[in-house]
């Protein structure tokens, strides 16, 4: 069982909500620091979905194609607030910092049908 799979299972049990991990093909992250930062980004995004978004259905997805790795965390909560850039919270800043540290990009978007999706892309 991968660390992300174990984490989503623990979140599901602890909070009584749907938190799933999907990974169609095994993804090899050969640098421990990169794997740690990806894990922590997922952890922060899931925490935000529960704490701020009220998400009851969270999907953590990891994929790799052509040497690129993508980690996405999607929830069905209230969505990203309009004033998120002015937020005093550190969570988004820390996720951005972690992504930049490993040479990745981080995108946080409000979904048209509600909820938020956080995507970390690493080339």
Report each predicted region and the residues it spans.
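Coiled-coil dimerization/phosphotransfer module
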Residues: 1-123
